């Protein structure tokens, strides 16, 4: 791999600066953990994934005949699903990437470090590890059962053992030596039996597998001239990295579910009066109540399905740790964590199931702007709780906190969400340090900038001097998996980018953010003005109506690309932004080609400084703070993907002209302000490869968006008729759904820039 942000580039930089030993030391401590999620922004059938793989190989081989055949096959292969996938279907779809891509890419990274940067004694099996949500993420998805969770974990174990079996089979043909051949044959046979076993035990345990391979290594080294030692070491490294778990399956559930469960549990423990009052008690009273009573499901005999399912998810975690090892399932994530009680309720659930001192990390997820602001006081409260303090001691005094970019942006706008997340990280580190807790962050980032995405390497590099990034954990969602991690080369390249950004933040780079008091005040003011502009826009009387009638939000569920409902559970069928998930919210604006969540409020906030003769303060911020430059750079991407000609007909619409013009004005203002700050003449002029990729994609999918808008207009007119023709309504809805599915999967239709091309794109250090 060549180019900026690769390991080779990192090696060259460290050598020039006489920091080679420092780099090795840093690489021994870095941990990168991409977590694959099945968020419904893309869902390719296995047949399509196979074609993509073959097509990639044909392109590399310059085999024009094969390319033409495969493109024809792709054109005739159905992308859409007649019915929604099950959570297990989603898991199977993503394990394809684990088995065929990540397994090789992560191994290649370890090989490169050992042969080019460090030596063969280099040890850091956690340098790149994997997380996995399909089959474990229950938040808003009633179709994820405990049976599916266990089935998914066994699938992960089966797939990794299958990969080991393939590698051992190749080795067996080479290791035909005395005292070695019979051992490798025994390993091969027992691995073959193991990958079809659906029980806790396997024909060969992980410890025994390692022991036998180390015996082979020693024997070959001592008696057989170290023949094929590289291949033996590579397999041992893979086993140390992936174990029998392949990827760690996370459990996630909404805090409101836990609250309901506890009310039902207490109904059985105390008298009905106490239970019915549980929701009316203060948080402190609830904490005292659940602390005062020892609870066990062995004595309570729960019958409520919600209680059984929730407690059963903990039993499933215990079962998975038994079959796949502790790393197989060791994190319980609490969505919409709003209080210390939310964390302590989950900890209590482990006690109820009889799992005392659980080998599990309880992970609060803070999402809204208010939750982010309260996160510090929440964590201080649990750090002071004696029971939770004991739990943390059993977890090496380490706490993971997850921060949600998608819902934060939906709630407070692009600039405010990103700035509040950064400030929360700083404050959470301080409070954790005060109590002797090592804090790790897990970033819930989506693909587009509006959901925390954009240039991930720039994002983490921009943290230098502000946040420690030796441990990077982030979600990889939807189309980002296939576009950035879909092939071995692109996967390795993007993983190296993450490693590089982490290393650069450990004194290997002079690009540090200078968060002086003046710059902080400027950021706070920008955030304040941006939030006001975004909030005023959200409160516009036509905001919800515009989204409901003129976007494709309501049709996301009909594409059948994900098992999870597009809305959170609600007591009403009324269109509400509170119950709307971030993915269809951002997706709706994207399909409108307006990308509001990726820029709205940014232009207004910068312009406030401009109009008040304080633009020099923003210029200073842009020059001195890489984090701010990264925000603007990613916002440029949102602006570049916008195309207001598509909806220009709404400019004079009797219902939506005002709100359309508000959006268009903010778009133009943001573009004007960003260009003025950056010194660019055009958006993304510093990223020609990325810009060309975006433009090609937009060129291909614009007809689909045009069809959508035509069908939406037609549908709105039909519904105004006294007796609308049902068949015409059905045709329009089908047009919208089909075109939506095509545009969601559009990244299949163009070749993304290669790692080499992307490495030439740079972010300016200042205007």
Question: Predicted segments — roles?
Answer:
Residues 276-369, 374:
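Conserved mid-sequence domains
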């Amino acid at each position: 791999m060549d180019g900026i942000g690769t390991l080779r580039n990192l090696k060259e930089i460290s050598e020039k600066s006489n920091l080679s030993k420092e780099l090795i030391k840093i690489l021994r401590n870095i941990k990168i953990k991409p977590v694959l999620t099945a968020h419904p922004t893309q869902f390719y059938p296995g047949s399509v994934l196979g074609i993509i793989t073959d097509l990639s190989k044909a392109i590399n081989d310059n085999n024009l005949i094969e390319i033409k055949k495969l493109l024809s096959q792709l054109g005739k292969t159905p992308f859409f699903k007649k019915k929604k996938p099950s959570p297990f279907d989603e898991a199977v779809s993503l394990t394809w990437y684990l088995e065929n891509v990540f397994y090789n890419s992560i191994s290649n990274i370890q090989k490169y470090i050992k042969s080019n940067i460090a030596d063969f004694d280099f040890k850091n099996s956690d340098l790149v590890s994997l997380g996995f949500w399909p089959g474990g993420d229950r938040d808003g998805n009633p179709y994820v059962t405990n049976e599916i969770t266990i089935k998914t974990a066994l699938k992960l174990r089966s797939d990794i053992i299958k990969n080991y079996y393939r590698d051992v089979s190749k080795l067996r043909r080479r290791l035909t030596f005395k005292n070695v051949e019979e051992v490798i044959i025994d390993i091969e046979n027992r691995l073959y039996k193991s990958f079809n076993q659906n029980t806790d035990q396997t024909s060969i345990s992980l410890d025994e597998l390692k022991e036998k391979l180390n015996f082979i290594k020693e024997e070959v080294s001592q008696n057989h001239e170290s023949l094929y030692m590289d291949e033996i070491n590579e397999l041992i490294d893979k086993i140390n990295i992936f174990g029998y778990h392949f990827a760690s399956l996370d459990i996630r559930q909404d805090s409101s579910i836990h609250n309901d469960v506890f009310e039902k549990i207490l109904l059985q423990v105390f008298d009905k009066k106490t239970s019915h009052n549980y929701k009316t008690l203060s948080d402190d009273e609830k904490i005292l109540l659940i602390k005062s009573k020892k609870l066990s499901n062995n004595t309570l005999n729960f019958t409520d399905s919600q209680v059984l399912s929730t407690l059963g998810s903990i039993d499933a975690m215990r079962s998975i740790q038994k079959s796949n090892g502790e790393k197989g399932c060791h994190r319980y994530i609490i969505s919409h964590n709003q209080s210390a009680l939310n964390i302590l309720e989950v900890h209590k659930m482990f006690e109820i199931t009889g799992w005392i001192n659980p080998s599990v990390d309880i992970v609060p997820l803070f999402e809204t702007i208010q939750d982010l602001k309260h996160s510090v006081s929440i964590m201080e409260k649990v750090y002071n709780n004696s029971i939770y303090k004991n739990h943390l001691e059993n977890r090496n005094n380490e706490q993971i906190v997850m921060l949600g970019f998608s819902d934060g942006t939906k709630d407070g706008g692009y600039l405010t969400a990103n700035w509040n997340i950064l400030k929360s990280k700083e404050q959470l580190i301080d409070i954790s340090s005060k109590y002797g807790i090592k804090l790790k962050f897990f970033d819930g980032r989506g693909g587009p900038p509006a959901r925390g995405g954009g240039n991930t390497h720039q994002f983490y590099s921009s943290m230098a001097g502000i946040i420690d990034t030796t441990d990077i954990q982030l979600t990889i969602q939807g189309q980002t998996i296939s576009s950035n991690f879909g092939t071995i080369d692109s996967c390795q390249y993007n993983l190296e980018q993450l490693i590089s950004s982490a290393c650069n933040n450990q004194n290997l780079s002079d690009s540090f953010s200078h968060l002086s008091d003046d710059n902080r005040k400027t950021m706070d003011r920008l955030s304040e003005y941006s939030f006001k502009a975004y909030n005023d826009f959200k409160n516009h009387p036509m905001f919800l109506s515009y989204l409901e009638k003129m976007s494709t939000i309501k049709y996301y569920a009909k594409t059948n690309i994900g098992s999870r409902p597009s809305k959170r559970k609600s007591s009403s069928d009324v269109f509400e932004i509170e119950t709307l998930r971030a993915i269809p919210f951002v997706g709706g604006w994207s399909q409108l080609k307006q990308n509001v969540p990726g820029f709205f409020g940014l232009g207004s906030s910068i312009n406030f400084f401009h109009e008040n003769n304080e633009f020099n303060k923003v210029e200073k911020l842009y020059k001195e703070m890489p984090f701010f430059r990264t925000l603007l750079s990613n916002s440029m991407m949102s602006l570049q993907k916008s195309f207001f000609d598509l909806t220009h007909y709404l400019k004079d619409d009797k219902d939506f002209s005002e709100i359309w013009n508000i959006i268009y004005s903010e778009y133009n203002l943001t573009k004007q302000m960003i260009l003025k700050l950056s010194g660019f003449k055009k958006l993304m002029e510093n990223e020609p490869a990325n810009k060309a990729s975006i433009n090609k994609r937009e060129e291909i999918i614009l007809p689909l968006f045009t069809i959508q808008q035509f069908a939406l207009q037609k549908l709105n007119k039909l519904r105004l008729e006294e007796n609308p023709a049902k068949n015409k309504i059905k045709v329009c809805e089908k047009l919208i759904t089909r075109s939506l599915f095509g545009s969601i999967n559009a990244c299949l239709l163009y070749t993304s820039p290669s790692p080499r091309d992307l490495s030439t794109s740079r972010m300016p250090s200042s205007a």
